[in-house]
Amino acid sequence: MKLTSTLTKNSGEVVNTSVIAKNNSIGRIFTMIEDWCADNDADYPRTCDVWKMNGKIQVSVKTRDRQFINIFDIED
């Protein structure tokens, strides 16, 4: 299983695409993302919405000064 991350600005511009994990279950990856979102740093506050859909995990993140969407494609 391979996890590819595509980071997109609110404008739709793709910022980065990279393979970030191999050989992890979808549940474990989803939990890692939820944990990252829950680990809210007072110096860098953020809010996240995380959901699974059609073999993808989508994360919408808002910080003080920006908003972005990260879509994780999961391949077997």
Predicted regions mapped to residue ranges:
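Short aromatic-glycine-(Arg/Gly/Cys) micro-motifs in beta-strand/loop hairpins
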Residues: 1-15
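Compositionally biased, low-complexity segments enriched in small residues
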Residues: 2-4, 22-28
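N-terminal compositionally biased, intrinsically disordered segments and leader/signal-like regions
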Residues: 7-9, 18, 32, 48, ...
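Generic "edge-of-domain/loop-turn" microfeature
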Residues: 10-12, 26, 66-68
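A short, exposed loop/beta-hairpin motif centered on an aromatic-Gly-Thr core
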Residues: 13-24
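A short, charged, amphipathic alpha-helix used as a generic interaction element across diverse proteins
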Residues: 25-44
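Short, mixed-charge low-complexity intrinsically disordered segments
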Residues: 39-76
